[in-house]
């Protein structure tokens, strides 16, 4: 369905939220953002994004889904580390890509702490300015990498994976491992970020519904 895909996304035109400005009991309604069957639209019109203190989440069909985007930040103290289930599935995905002949490295970029993201973002701002940096880098507290559920795939050449056939493989097969390609071409307005063929987000069983 489009429900979680839209909930996970962020509109670049809105100002980022702050954890201080939202109470721990606040719930926000997110309207359905994509088309589907009438029955789907009737049952999936809205999702409640709930402040859990250090992060925001939405209840999916199967499990709680941590939400991290330009609307919903995480506390600087939120430090879950790399999710072991997500990592295990990522390694399976990488192995499958390698077996299919893609030059994918065993190395990847996974969990990043608030402090690490602060350094990265500031480096990008110093290099390109804040407006440009905001197109391709999350501000500290707003990066999916801080959830421990996001991973950037790297090729054997050391570069992020952008090759067209590899990107298509991910679109076709990532959901088999519980992942979605988060930042798609043509969805920059919705996500607030440039397309990233290499960036995967683990959502478990929800992935196949999102990809459908």
Predicted regions and their residues:
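Sec-dependent bacterial lipoprotein signal peptides
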Residues: 1-9
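Extracytoplasmic cell-surface/polysaccharide-interacting catalytic and binding patches
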Residues: 11-212
